[in-house]
Amino acid sequence: MKNDRVYCEQILDSIGKIQRFVNGIDKDVFLNDQKTQSAVIMQLALIGELAKRVSEETKTAIAVPWKEIAGFRDRAIHDYYQIDLGIAWDTITLDLEPLADALQKYLK
């Protein structure tokens, strides 16, 4: 459980990095900016790796789609060139804030 706290903090750190990477840009800019894409995909993969390490007990306590979060890591690492960047953008804009909120609530 002690490590779970660290994993959750690291996930929050990665979310913060992604938010800084995409601050002030829209989807069209993201889809045409390979440097930002690479940085974001790396952080999403890291979030997925950390999600795999969180204990089942903690996963039960935090109601987020852990399996899907971990699954993105597998796609990012094994099928990097098959990643749908539109879906990645949707993940950034729709899913990261609720994930951050859930983790922050758990850590309090």
Task: Name every feature range the model reports, one short phrase each.
Residues M1-K108:
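Solvent-exposed interaction patches of small proteins and small membrane subunits
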